[in-house]
Regions:
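Canonical positions in the second alpha-helix
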Residues: 118, 151-152, 185-186
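Noncatalytic regulatory segments and standalone regulatory/sensor domains
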Residues: 44-130
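Active-site-adjacent substructure of cysteine-protease-like catalytic cores
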Residues: 4-53
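Helix-start (N-cap) detector for alpha-helical repeat units in TPR-like alpha-solenoids
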Residues: 93, 126-127, 160-161, 194-195
Length: 221
């Protein structure tokens, strides 16, 4: 579930994208509320109407003005139950990652799919790359996490957290030399970061043996 910002423009944009939107209305008064859930399934700007699936009514048509008043009395709460491959058109990247992270706690496979589709939409967002790499790593899909961090660093070569996580992923696939090179790249970017210094010492405790097929790591200039 993804909560929308409460505006008619956002609401109509989602509906125009064939995404039904669950809304809360107050059909009563502020001092005597009558809470009601409905699903917005259509609108007509020429006729100034909104079509709701409300209770047992599949197509309840009301004026936009009336709908907006009852919606406003419920603080314009709205949400969509989006599938991983159908990101809300009005979604904010960082907020979307936070929502998917909550899903990840119970449904890690669905979260991975959601992160992958989010990267297709926001390839320049480092947080999404980190989230995908971390999700794969936590599921012990170490080679997948290596590939994810490597690809992410093409877009964000100066992101020390990506380098740090890339180093740990490389270490998990027995690429010790590449792992140490990657953590040195992270430290070069932020030499006084105590967490990176800890990672540097930690990774140097492992055997530096190298598997047959390992990444060749080059720090950004």
């Amino acid at each position: 579930p993804y909560e929308l910002t409460g505006s008619l423009d956002v609401l109509f944009a989602e509906v125009a994208n064939n995404q039904p939107v669950l809304v809360m209305q107050n059909l009563g008064f502020d001092w005597l509320p009558q809470w009601h859930y409905a699903v917005v399934v259509g609108y007509d700007l020429e006729r100034e109407t909104v079509t709701l699936r409300s209770g047992e009514e599949k197509r309840h048509v009301v004026p936009i003005y009336t709908f907006d008043k009852t919606w406003a009395r419920a603080r314009r709460w709205a949400m969509v139950a989006a599938l991983p491959e159908r990101i809300p058109v009005s979604a904010d990247a960082d907020q979307y990652v936070r929502v998917v992270h909550e899903v990840e706690k119970l449904h890690p496979e669905i979260a991975v799919s959601a992160y992958q589709h989010a990267i297709d939409r926001w390839p320049d967002n480092a947080l999404i790359w980190l989230a995908l790499g971390n999700a794969l790593y936590s599921q012990q899909q170490y080679q997948g996490s290596v590939t994810t961090y490597r690809e992410a660093l093409r877009f964000h070569p100066d992101n020390e957290q990506l380098w740090n996580n890339y180093a740990y992923a490389l270490n998990s696939v027995e690429c010790g030399e590449a792992s140490r090179a990657a953590i040195h790249c992270a430290v070069r970017i932020k030499p006084n970061d105590p967490l990176l210094i800890d990672s540097l010492y930690d990774l140097h405790q492992y055997n530096a043996k190298t598997a047959l097929l390992c990444d060749v790591v080059h720090c950004p200039l």
